From Swiss-Prot:
A UniProt-annotated Pfam family: HSP20
Official protein name in the record: Small heat shock protein C2
Alphabetical UniProt keywords: Stress response
Protein family: Belongs to the small heat shock protein (HSP20) family.
Keyword Iron found: no
Signal peptide: none
InterPro entries xrefs: A-crystallin/Hsp20_dom (IPR002068), CS_dom (IPR007052), HSP20-like_chaperone (IPR008978), Small_HSP (IPR031107)
Residue span, sHSP domain: 43-154
Gene: hspC2
PROSITE patterns listed in its UniProt record: SHSP
Family matches, as CDD domains: ACD_sHsps-like (cd06464)
């Protein structure tokens, strides 16, 4: 009587299978990414989504947003209902429009990034500064209320 057990494979066979599977996954990812972005953009025209770091200290939150090549006057920051929205525009230089590009990887156009903030912020004291292509936003936390005893009356 023979057992119908799967064959034990060595490490290199498993590794090769995983590499093939990853390659196929990448092919499908590329295909569907192109499919879902068409006709709004092509692989050479990607949306400008600013890279953002958010950190927290005891006193507040700090955001650092990369905005290289953007002028300070083209940045707009708003807060509404604990949602911080950063909008901007990166203009393409008009003299560059007539060039015959062989490769084009820089981003141009408008962008918007919205970040939901926690409820414990003091939105009246938010500060922003723009330096060397980095937007620094400081969001202080509200001061915690002190506990007080409430007398129960009969």
């Amino acid at each position: 009587m023979a057992f119908n057990l799967p064959r034990i494979r060595n490490k290199s066979e498993v590794s090769n299978d995983l590499m093939r599977r990853n390659h196929l996954d990448n092919i499908f990812d590329d295909f569907f990414n192109e499919f879902y972005t068409f006709p709004y953009s092509s692989s050479t025209e990607k949306n400008l989504i600013p890279r953002t770091d958010i950190s927290e200290t005891d006193s507040g939150y700090s955001l650092e947003v990369e905005l290289p090549g953007i002028n300070q006057k083209d940045i707009d920051i708003n807060i509404d209902n604990h949602i911080l929205t950063i909008k901007g525009q990166k203009e393409e230089k008009s003299e560059e429009k007539n060039k015959n590009y062989h490769m084009r990887e820089r981003y141009y156009g408008s962008f918007q990034r919205s970040i939901s903030l926690p409820a414990n912020i003091n939105d009246d004291a938010i500060n922003a500064r723009f330096e060397n292509g980095i937007l620094h936003i400081t969001i202080p936390k509200k001061e915690q209320g002190k506990t007080r005893k409430i007398e129960v009356k009969g």
